[in-house]
């Protein structure tokens, strides 16, 4: 198993959220569903499924293509944006009684507490999730489950920085020699970075970010962007960014390297859910099952560098196993009331 129970955050025990949402108290998850010929036929009649996602577009589109190859006649429409933008979009649409999306996925666990509370999600448990996902990687009432996990890592361009000179910790990023050479993603756009900012502020204190903000940071939006800035040579160091993008670049020969900071590396969990008012309910149900099956989870790992909860997924030997990485976690229940404070402090320290 690539993401074992020992590495799952106790604070991400999603059943905790049930206590916060008494209006949605349930007797438990519904009976798991299998993919049947009848479901496939009904999905083909609908002909399309719309997937709102925060996963890197290249990875999400590969998943969509794999689905189309397995189920000819059903088109996957991938709508990719940063987690916070996905959240804003679905909130605006549902607030206006507009229902375009069938399946939704973001890397901010808080979103799914809110989606569930608002009654926007359908109870649906694919058989694969029921069989293989640990209890703390799925909602106790069957509204959502962990589609992926990834880390927000420090990294560097190996043509611009020697290994012996590279930062080994978050504190090392405060060294004056890195001033003007660092790129960083934004918590107001990226769920990964919102989660990471929460974890790091609790571990290191806000004074760390205050000092980092004085390093003349190149500010970008998505956590997919810093690795690409390193690859293009626009900056030498990334303060944060998706581990999976770094895997993808490094494994194609791009001169980048990952650093797992001595203080710890933040973990982000990307949940997925079936929307209650999905315009293509059968195609949505089929696609929702598909994204959790072994082959899709293996595709996410092989092509996208994502960590999986599926016990059958095998990671590439060149990748550092989670058991050898010190991890930092964010509790979505504690993060939820702090989101606006985090955005305000970040703007104060980074000017954006």
Residue ranges and their predicted role:
Residues 1-13:
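N-terminal secretory signal peptides and thylakoid transit peptides that target proteins
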């Amino acid at each position: 198993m690539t993401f074992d129970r020992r590495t799952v955050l106790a604070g991400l025990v999603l059943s905790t959220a049930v206590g916060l949402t008494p209006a949605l108290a349930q007797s438990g998850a519904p009976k798991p569903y299998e993919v049947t010929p009848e479901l496939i036929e009904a999905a083909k009649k609908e002909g399309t499924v719309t997937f709102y996602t925060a996963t890197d577009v290249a990875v999400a589109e590969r998943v969509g293509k794999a689905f189309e190859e397995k189920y000819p006649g059903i088109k996957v429409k991938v709508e990719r944006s940063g987690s916070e933008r996905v959240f804003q979009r679905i909130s605006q649409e549902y607030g206006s009684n507009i229902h375009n999306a069938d399946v939704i996925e973001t890397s901010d666990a808080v979103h799914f507490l809110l989606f569930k509370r608002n009654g926007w999600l359908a109870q649906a448990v694919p058989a694969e999730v029921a069989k293989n996902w640990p209890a703390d990687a799925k909602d106790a009432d069957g509204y959502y489950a962990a589609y992926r996990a990834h880390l927000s890592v420090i990294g560097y361009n190996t043509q611009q920085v020697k290994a012996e000179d590279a930062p080994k910790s978050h504190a090392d990023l405060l060294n004056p020699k890195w001033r003007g050479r660092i790129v960083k993603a934004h918590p107001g756009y990226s769920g990964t970075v919102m989660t990471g900012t929460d974890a790091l502020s609790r571990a290191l204190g806000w004074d760390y970010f205050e000092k980092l903000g004085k390093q003349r940071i190149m500010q970008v939006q998505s956590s997919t962007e810093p690795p690409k800035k390193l690859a293009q040579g626009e900056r030498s160091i990334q303060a944060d960014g998706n581990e999976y993008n770094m895997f993808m670049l490094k494994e194609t020969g791009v001169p980048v390297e990952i650093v797992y900071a001595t203080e710890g590396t933040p973990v982000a969990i990307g949940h997925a859910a079936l929307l209650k008012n999905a315009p293509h309910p059968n195609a949505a149900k089929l696609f929702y099952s598909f994204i959790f099956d072994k082959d899709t989870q293996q595709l996410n790992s092989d092509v996208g560098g994502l960590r999986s909860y599926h016990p059958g997924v095998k990671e590439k030997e060149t990748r550092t196993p989670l058991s050898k990485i010190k991890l930092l976690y964010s509790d979505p229940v504690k993060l939820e009331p702090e989101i606006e404070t985090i955005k305000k402090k970040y703007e104060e320290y980074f000017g954006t």
